[in-house]
Amino acid sequence: MPVTAPQTLGELMATVPSITDHLFRNAPKAAMTVYSQMMPGEGVRPEFTTWRDEQTAWRTTIAVHDQSYHMMSLHVRGPDALAFTQSLSVNTFKNFGVGAAKQLVCCSPEGFLIGDAILYRLAEEDFLVVGNPATTDWVDYNAQALSFDVTTESDPMWTLNKAKAREFYRFQVEGPKAWALLEELNGGPLPEIKFFRSAEIGLGPHRARGMRHSMGGMPGLEIYGPWVDYKAVRSLLQKAGAKHGLRMVGSIAYFTTVIESGWWAVPVSAVYTGAGTQGFRDWCSAQHAAMRMSLGGSYYSPDIADYYLTPYDVNYGHIIKFDHDFIGRAALEAIHDQPHRKKVTLVWNADDVLSVMSAMFEDSVVKPLPITLPLAATARMHYDRVMDKDGNTIGLATYPGYTANERAMMSLASLDPGFTEPGTEVVLLWGEDGGGARSGGNLEPHRQVKIRATVAPSPISQAAQSYRTAIGIKRGSLQEV
């Protein structure tokens, strides 16, 4: 009899000895392969000029990030749409009018992060969740499991999109010259748009919504409109922006924005353990993110729960509001006054980085894992072990990468209290536990090495920090608006 593949996450976990090891074996094991697959070559090339030139553009001229392909979108409609989405998010939805957006931060009943996304209020009873598929999956499941009068409709990311058409195109236009370009295309001054608010704007002959938001920490707008206008709007931006030094941002540079802006985009979603998420595991199928994700990095624990983060661990503590009931509230209230890890940036020691790179040209039998620029992650969910000088684990790091703007190799990290002050020296362990053996042949044999690192603020960039200060955003995460 042929063996039937597990149909749900619950069935999968019943058949594998360790879900951690299973996720380590999931391929591909190279971040740039993952990201280029998420953004198809027809619309978003890996590079339009060079990834270094494109990174520089969001600090010096204009960068256009094409977000039309890689994110999941999920409509939530019905008379209970506001109450339902509020029941899933740790932050309050007070003053959430039509045309506004909110951060949707979802937790498990045990208080660990599922993921976060952007929630747009398109109409009185029509909300749109856009972002990480782990988050849209959680929303979709709960719409069916909970007793709210809502319906959902999915607009899948391109790789899962059989129609090969989206409801909306989506471009992030940002940089010091972005406003001049947008006003030119609008035919005059733009309306005043507060952070996470939107307004109708003109793009030549086309109408679109412009939302105040940023990927790289510079002033700009996220603009979106009907898919039928996608190619025309893209061409218009490119032609009108040429004199301003506009650069289209390819898939390689796009995913380095989180290192500068300080967004922990893809946590290990806390759905693999806990009685409160058993229903999700029984619902979750092979098309959903929890079964497709890959895990990598130097941190290893057989207990997948050791990878979980709370909102406090990624500097979301200030947006948690206990003025409403939400999944995970009791658990978060119980730990509210306890010490928490803090999200920071780690700046890698340049000499140690060069030592790893130079090993590629040596004759040693087992070399360190090469550091791929600009993104060195070995999985969609990459977690490195961070230690003190005595070798004690003090936290986890993600998104190892380089930006030409900072001229440094960096990671985002969540560290124990006592190690989060800027200037603190720590050690990052580089290379997978087991030297690649856990990755099922998808990663070459290598040896682990220690890389010195220095703690810096998150976000790292002065541009990102000053931008948040100017518009009332607390450093490292979104302030409630």
Positions of PLM-derived features:
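Conserved, structured C-terminal
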Residues: 1-41, 46, 123-481
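A short catalytic or substrate-binding loop motif that flags glycine-/basic-rich loops and adjacent residues
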Residues: 66, 109-111, 376-379
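A short acidic, glycine/proline-enriched capping/turn motif at secondary-structure boundaries
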Residues: 79-81, 91-92, 106-114, 125-127, ...
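Short amphipathic beta-strand starts and helix->beta connectors
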Residues: 53-60, 106-116, 202-211, 394-396
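Residue-level detector of beta-strand structural context in well-folded domains
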Residues: 63, 72, 104, 117-118, ...
